[in-house]
């Protein structure tokens, strides 16, 4: 059984054959930490979490290195910090913590390495210097730009001609560039900006462009060539297109990533998610509604990862009903560990066909209810748990699932928020949180050592 993945670069489904089976390398574009993650961001994380699990199953955990970056320097971050009147580091640290809480809620494993852009400025400068030395980049008006026309096969990933690619794309500082399509590698500091948003470089105080960050961090931890590069379909152009161009030009013998995997868009009630439309939904919003993380994870896996996925109340309700059905199917059965069924694994090995994998779990659940022998019931129930666990689901006992109206992660998050409020003598907020939990029949008990424990009424 071989893993097949759709490669955007070749536009074909290919057998996954890493360059070194003992050192499989995957890079995924992580969050820009300026605001709380929305469910569209989360789809990407859940998809590549599943791919990580599949690759570990094939090659072993020690053989797989999964790098997912944190972009913690960006114009959006600077603008957001200024609008909130807070230090940029306070903002990025806060949003990064929220991202980790959200991904734990969704049952995602941590990557092997999670580098921050601000901690890799030296590598970015090294690559930019290489590009300048090889006439792929130039300095003008205190900026460093990449010369797009110098890059061979620039349009290979997007499979569009150059004019089409840039239609409707906002191009800044076009008067100072050789070509309007050239993109920034390094930009100078602006007047009155906070000191901690800019860095020393051979071209003066400034900061990197967005695209160079991922090239630098993938090079640092995975080398010139690696196996998989993942991200949302919206990143194909310009971000991933520019990554390939600058990395291959900086390292002429490099092919950069071999397999390019892209997940589809997420809409809300048939419309593109947008703050202006008022349909912008964060993971925190779902947590506040006490929607269990497993429900959201199953919803995000319910459609094939390359297809669009629409968020709506019915889809979430359907995911909840499916999980209820699975948990009911294992009632009072002493489940045992069984091998992952071959048809289930075949579905995942076929370009992560999660709709088929979910159908197979449903078939095992049906099998429990129509089984004629206890041995058959036990096998079907065990297969449900084994398959669901593999894709990051059914991590609770049946009792926990049906008797926990509120997620433990969410309870502890509120308790920590309440403790912080008490330290700040914000008694109104502390009482509000206590009452909020009390409505869910959660009783708090403050201890003499300044900790708080909880129990269900």
Swiss-Prot record:
GO terms for cellular component: cytosol. Its EC number is 6.1.1.16. It catalyses: tRNA(Cys) + L-cysteine + ATP = L-cysteinyl-tRNA(Cys) + AMP + diphosphate. ATP binds at residue 275. Zn(2+) binds at residues 29, 214, 239, 243. A motif ('KMSKS' region) lies at residues 272-276. A motif ('HIGH' region) lies at residues 31-41. Its cofactor is Zn(2+). It is an enzyme of class 6 (ligase). Keywords: Aminoacyl-tRNA synthetase, ATP-binding, Cytoplasm, Ligase, Metal-binding, Nucleotide-binding, Protein biosynthesis, Zinc. Its main location: cytoplasm. Disulfide bonds: none annotated. One of its GO terms (biological process) is cysteinyl-tRNA aminoacylation. It is found in: Cytoplasm. It holds the Pfam family tRNA-synt_1e. Binds 1 zinc ion per subunit. One of its GO terms (molecular function) is zinc ion binding. Gene3D superfamilies: Cysteine-tRNA ligase, C-terminal anti-codon recognition domain (1.20.120.1910), HUPs (3.40.50.620). InterPro entries: Cys-tRNA-ligase (IPR015803), Cys-tRNA-synt_Ia_DALR (IPR015273), Cys-tRNA/MSH_ligase (IPR024909), Rossmann-like_a/b/a_fold (IPR014729), tRNA-synt_1_cat_dom (IPR032678), tRNAsynth_Ia_anticodon-bd (IPR009080). Belongs to the class-I aminoacyl-tRNA synthetase family. Monomer. PANTHER family: CYSTEINE--TRNA LIGASE, CYTOPLASMIC, CYSTEINYL-TRNA SYNTHETASE. This is Cysteine--tRNA ligase. It comes from Rickettsia typhi (strain ATCC VR-144 / Wilmington). The gene is cysS.
């Amino acid at each position: 059984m071989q893993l097949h993945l759709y490669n955007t670069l070749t536009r074909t489904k290919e057998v996954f054959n890493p360059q070194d089976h003992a050192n499989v390398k995957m890079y995924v574009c992580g969050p820009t930490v300026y605001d709380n993650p929305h469910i569209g961001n989360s789809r990407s994380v859940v998809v590549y979490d599943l791919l990580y699990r599949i690759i570990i199953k094939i090659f072993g955990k020690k053989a797989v290195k999964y790098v997912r970056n944190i972009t913690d320097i960006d114009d959006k971050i600077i603008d957001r910090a200024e609008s909130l009147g807070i230090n940029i580091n306070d903002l990025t640290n806060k949003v990064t913590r929220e991202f980790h809480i959200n991904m734990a809620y969704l049952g995602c494993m941590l990557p092997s390495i999670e580098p921050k852009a601000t901690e890799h400025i030296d590598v970015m400068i090294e690559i930019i210097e290489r590009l300048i030395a090889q006439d792929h980049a130039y300095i003008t008006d205190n900026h460093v730009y990449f010369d797009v026309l110098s890059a061979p096969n620039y349009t290979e990933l997007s499979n569009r001609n150059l004019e089409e690619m840039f239609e409707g794309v906002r191009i800044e500082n076009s008067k100072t560039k050789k070509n309007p399509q050239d993109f920034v590698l390094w930009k100078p500091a602006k007047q009155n900006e906070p000191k901690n948003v800019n860095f020393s470089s051979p071209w003066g105080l400034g900061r990197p462009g967005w695209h160079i960050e991922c090239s630098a961090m993938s090079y640092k931890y995975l080398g010139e060539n690696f196996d998989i590069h993942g991200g949302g379909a919206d990143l194909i152009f310009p971000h991933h297109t520019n990554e390939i161009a600058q990395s291959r030009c900086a390292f002429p013998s490099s092919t950069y990533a071999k397999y390019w995997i892209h997940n589809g868009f997420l809409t809300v009630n048939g419309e593109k998610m947008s703050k202006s439309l008022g349909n912008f939904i964060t993971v925190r919003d779902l947590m506040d509604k006490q929607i269990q993380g497993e429900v959201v994870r199953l919803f995000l896996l319910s459609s094939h990862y390359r297809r669009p996925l629409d968020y709506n109340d019915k889809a979430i309700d359907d995911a909840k009903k499916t999980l209820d059905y699975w948990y009911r199917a294992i009632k009072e059965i002493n489940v045992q560990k069984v091998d992952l069924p071959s048809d289930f694994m075949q579905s995942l090995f076929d370009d992560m066909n999660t709709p088929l994998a979910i159908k197979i779990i449903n078939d095992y659940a049906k099998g429990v209810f129509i089984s004629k022998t206890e041995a058959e019931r036990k096998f079907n129930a065990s297969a449900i748990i084994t398959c669901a666990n593999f894709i990051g689901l059914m991590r609770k006992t049946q009792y926990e699932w049906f008797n926990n109206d509120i997620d433990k992660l969410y309870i502890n998050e509120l308790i920590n928020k309440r403790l912080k409020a008490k330290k700040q003598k914000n008694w109104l907020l502390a009482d509000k949180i206590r009452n909020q939990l009390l409505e869910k029949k959660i009783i708090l008990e403050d201890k003499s050592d300044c900790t708080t424990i909880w129990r269900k009424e």
